[in-house]
Design a protein with these regions (language model features):
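N-terminal presequence-like segments and the immediate start of the first folded domain
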Residues: 1-59, 63-76, 82-134
Length: 134
């Protein structure tokens, strides 16, 4: 069986610069690259505001999901990278739980020393199964 890969990008310069897509679908699985806090024009959002960065990052995750006709309840796993994890863990946990409601995907949260952008405090990737009932 020969599967096709469907990719999606926001059209941001860094996608070409680093040679990646925001998400790639193979069959019923969508692999979502780490999302970060930016607006529709690629401007970074939330310098020094961890909660705003998480909320904006999750909004960008929703935008990616919509390109594949997916919903949050079809996310089966998240990977959350956080700078200053000890300081930001409670906020991370609260906002992750708020975002998913009663849905409980598998999740890995890791503290990191740096992320791609100097002011970036969080990055969230996801694994989505389109064959999971939404």
């Amino acid at each position: 069986m020969n599967s096709q890969v469907k990719v999606f990008g926001f059209g941001m310069p860094w996608e070409s610069l680093y040679g990646y897509s925001q998400a790639a679908q193979v069959g019923d699985t969508v692999y979502v690259s780490g999302q970060l806090s930016h607006d529709r024009h690629g401007n970074f959002v939330g310098t020094d505001d961890f909660e705003l960065q998480v909320r904006t990052t999750l909004e960008n995750l929703d935008a990616v999901l919509s390109q594949f006709g997916a919903e949050r309840s079809q996310i089966v796993e998240t990977t959350v990278l956080v700078r200053n994890l000890r300081e930001n863990f409670d906020t991370t946990a609260r906002l992750h739980s708020e975002y998913f409601g009663k849905h409980r995907p598998a999740s890995t949260v890791m503290g990191v020393s740096d992320l791609a952008l100097p002011d970036q405090l969080v990055e969230i990737g996801a694994l989505v199964r389109l064959d999971v009932k939404a």
